[in-house]
C-alpha cells in the first residue's frame, strides 16, 4: 500500500486473539480522528522486514509533514506515543503538564515492561499450545500485575491509570490485557479485582472503544 497522506496502520487478519494488541492504535485513531487507513498484511512476507525487524504488528508508516521524509514506527507503545506527538496537540492523551506527562510516561512504560509481555505469553500458550501443561508461573505473574493495577485504581479519586480525570495512553496500553474479555479467556474472575472491573467498564462505555471492539474481530475477513 502506497502512502497517500493518511497514516498507514499495519495489522493482520483477526482471529480469536491476534487483534488484541493492535486495538491500541485503532482506539486512539477513533478517539482523536487522525487520517489513517488500515493495511491487513501477511507477516510472513519478506518486505515487512523493512517495517518491523521481526515482522510484527501493530506498526505504521507516515510522512514527515515538513521534510516529506518517510516515517516508520513499530511496537504498540511506540505507535501510540508517535501518534499523540503528531496529532494530540493539546496533550489530552499524553499529558498537559510536566507532572501529567511524567505519570503517563511511567505507567505506559511499566505496562510495556510488565503486564503486556506477560499477558502476551499467556495468550501464546493458551492459544498456540492448548495441550501443553499449564505454565504455572505465568498466571502468578500476571495476577501480580493485576494486583498492582488494582492497588493503583483503588487510590482516592483514581478513575483512570495515570491521571484521575481522564484516560490516557496508559489506559490504552493496559486495556487489552485488563478488559473483561481477557479475564474470561484466561479463566480468571475479574470480580476479584473490583477496581479494575469498574475501570474497564468506564473504558468500555467510550464510543471509540465500543466501535473498535465491535469491528476488530472481523478485520481482514
Curated annotation (Swiss-Prot):
Q: What class of enzyme is it?
A: transferase
The UniProt record lists the GST N-terminal domain at: 1-91
Could you tell me the keywords of this UniProt record? Answer: Transferase
Q: In which pathway does it act?
A: Mycotoxin biosynthesis
Q: Gene3D superfamilies under this entry? A: 1.20.1050.130
Task: Please list the coiled coil stretches.
Answer: none
Q: Which GO terms describe its molecular function?
A: glutathione transferase activity
User: What's the domain of life for this entry?
Assistant: Eukaryota
Q: What is its EC number?
A: 2.5.1.18
- GST C-terminal domain residues are 97-221
> Mind telling me which InterPro entries this protein's record contains?
Glutathione-S-Trfase_C-like, Glutathione-S-Trfase_C_sf, Glutathione_S-Trfase, Glutathione_S-Trfase_N, GST_C, Thioredoxin-like_sf
List the catalysed reactions: RX + glutathione = an S-substituted glutathione + a halide anion + H(+)
- What family, per the record? Belongs to the GST superfamily.
Describe the task this protein carries out. Glutathione S-transferase; part of the gene cluster that mediates the biosynthesis of aspirochlorine (or antibiotic A30641), an unusual halogenated spiro compound with distinctive antifungal properties due to selective inhibition of protein biosynthesis, and which is also active against bacteria, viruses, and murine tumor cells. The non-ribosomal peptide synthetase (NRPS) aclP is responsible the formation of the diketopiperazine (DKP) core from the condensation of 2 phenylalanine residues.
Protein name, UniProt field: Glutathione S-transferase aclG
Native source organism of the sequence: Aspergillus oryzae (strain ATCC 42149 / RIB 40)
Q: Which gene encodes it?
A: aclG
Amino acid at each position: 500500500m502506497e502512502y497517500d497522506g493518511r497514516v498507514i496502520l499495519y495489522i493482520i487478519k483477526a482471529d480469536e486473539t491476534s487483534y488484541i494488541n493492535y486495538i491500541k492504535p485503532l482506539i486512539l485513531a477513533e478517539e482523536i480522528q487522525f487520517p489513517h487507513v488500515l493495511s491487513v498484511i501477511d507477516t510472513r512476507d519478506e518486505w515487512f522486514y523493512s517495517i518491523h525487524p521481526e515482522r510484527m504488528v501493530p506498526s505504521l508508516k507516515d510522512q514527515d509533514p515538513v521534510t516529506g521524509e518517510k516515517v516508520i514506527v513499530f511496537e504498540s507503545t511506540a505507535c501510540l506515543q508517535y501518534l499523540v506527538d503528531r496529532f494530540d496537540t493539546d496533550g489530552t492523551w499524553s499529558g498537559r503538564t510536566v507532572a501529567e506527562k511524567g505519570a503517563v510516561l511511567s505507567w505506559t512504560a511499566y505496562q510495556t515492561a510488565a503486564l503486556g509481555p506477560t499477558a502476551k505469553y499467556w495468550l501464546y500458550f493458551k492459544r498456540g499450545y492448548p495441550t501443553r501443561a499449564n505454565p504455572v508461573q505465568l498466571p502468578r505473574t500476571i495476577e501480580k500485575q493485576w494486583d498492582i493495577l488494582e492497588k493503583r485504581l483503588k487510590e482516592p479519586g483514581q478513575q483512570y491509570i495515570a491521571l484521575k480525570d481522564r484516560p490516557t495512553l496508559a489506559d490504552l496500553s493496559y486495556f487489552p490485557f485488563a478488559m473483561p474479555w481477557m479475564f474470561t479467556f484466561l479463566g480468571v474472575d475479574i470480580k476479584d479485582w473490583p477496581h479494575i472491573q469498574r475501570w474497564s467498564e468506564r473504558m468500555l462505555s467510550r464510543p471509540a472503544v465500543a466501535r473498535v471492539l465491535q469491528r476488530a474481530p472481523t478485520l481482514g475477513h
